[in-house]
Swiss-Prot record:
Source organism of the structure: Marinomonas sp. (strain MWYL1)
GO CC term (a single one): cytosol
Entry protein name: UPF0301 protein Mmwyl1_0539
Similarity-based family: Belongs to the UPF0301 (AlgH) family.
Annotated Pfam families: DUF179 (PF02622)
UniProt cross-references to NCBIfam families, sorted A to Z: PRK00228.1-1 (NF001266)
Length: 188
């Protein structure tokens, strides 16, 4: 077994055209963790049919920041689909916050949602339900199978690009026009 390991933590996974899994088709995933034991990420470009008001009502949280009322909640992936995750800038952290980089953190607490609802949250954030997960070697096999393009994450794409434009914006980070790629794969 090869002892060399490259972590793709703080990278985007961009689904390839032939990937027809309904959970991951036409998605951009931000990888929060990637070790030899597996990987965990959040789909960033799939708004759900739930907005912040509905989530806050369900959790008994009062919203004091009017701009949040229609803030979409995103489908972060098929794993733990009922659990909330918040990708956010590191200007605000909580006791259970996982610092991914110096600029990006991941939180999953009611306290974080309450602070956001009060208008005391981080400068930029994305709230999701669920995440994506891979067992040891699974993500590497999918990348070797050409299911994913991988590039370093871009904060502007992550937090400031509308979800319907994130797929194209992420591919531009790589300098690729996905409309020119064939859905067929091969290794020659």
């Amino acid at each position: 077994m090869n002892a060399f390991f490259d972590s793709f933590k703080n990278h985007f996974l961009i689904s390839m055209p032939h990937l027809d899994d309904p959970h991951f088709e036409h998605t951009v995933i931000y990888l929060c963790e990637h070790t030899k034991a597996g990987a965990m990420g959040i789909i960033i470009n799939r708004p759900s049919n739930v907005d912040f008001t509905e989530l806050a009502d369900h959790l008994g949280i009062q919203i004091h920041s009017p701009r949040l009322s229609s803030e979409p909640i995103y489908t972060g992936g098929p794993v733990e689909a009922e659990r909330g995750f918040i990708l956010h800038t590191t200007d605000k952290v909580w006791s259970n916050t996982l610092r991914v980089t110096d600029e990006v953190s991941l939180s999953a607490s009611l306290e974080a949602l309450e602070d956001i609802a009060q208008g005391n949250g981080p400068d930029a954030f994305r709230i999701t339900l669920g995440c994506a997960g891979w067992d040891a070697g699974q993500l590497e096999a999918e990348i070797a199978n050409n299911d994913w393009l991988v590039c370093e994450a871009d904060l502007d794409v992550l937090f400031h690009t509308p979800s319907d434009m994130q797929f194209t914006a992420a591919t531009r980070v790589l300098g690729i026009d996905m409309t020119r790629l064939s859905p067929d794969i091969g290794h020659g």
